[in-house]
């Protein structure tokens, strides 16, 4: 979306003559409706201390829009950080194959087999409960450090 269209959309949603939206939900890492799968640490097994944690992708795509929305809004905006799915390395295998029609429906867009199944099922393994908690806190702190008024998790 070009910058002019982005600005108009933000005005229509958050601006004084728009919808006056005051709530934004931001997924932690990719989610089912993301254009691609991504996570803030490439290999959390090799990096259990999360030393390589980075929200650079968010800085490029998410944070600029959030900051514009906050600037445009006449009222404070509440931001909900939504943990969607832990890194795939910490999860069990999904029960349904990611290209199965039960996942996306008969018209679902196929997901290439080489893409890990981060958002397509499976459960967090108990041995990673503490790691996932640290990951979420790290994400929350990174957004607070960027000046985003996260009020809910």
Role assignments for model-derived ranges:
Residues 1-150:
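N-terminal catalytic cores of secreted or lumenal carbohydrate-active enzymes
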């Amino acid at each position: 979306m070009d910058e002019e269209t982005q600005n108009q959309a933000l005005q229509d949603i958050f601006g004084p003559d728009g919808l006056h939206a005051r709530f934004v939900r931001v997924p932690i890492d990719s989610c089912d409706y993301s254009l691609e799968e991504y996570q803030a640490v490439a290999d959390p097994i090799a990096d259990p201390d999360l030393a390589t944690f980075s929200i650079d992708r968010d800085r490029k795509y998410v944070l600029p829009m959030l900051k514009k929305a906050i600037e445009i809004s006449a009222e404070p905006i509440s931001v909900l950080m939504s943990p969607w799915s832990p890194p795939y390395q910490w999860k069990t295998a999904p029960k349904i194959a990611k290209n199965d029609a039960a996942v996306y429906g008969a018209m679902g867009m196929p997901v290439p087999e080489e893409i890990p199944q981060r958002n397509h099922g499976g459960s967090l393994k108990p041995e990673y409960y503490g790691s996932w908690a640290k990951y979420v806190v790290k994400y929350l702190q990174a957004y607070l450090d960027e000046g985003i008024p996260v009020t809910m998790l």
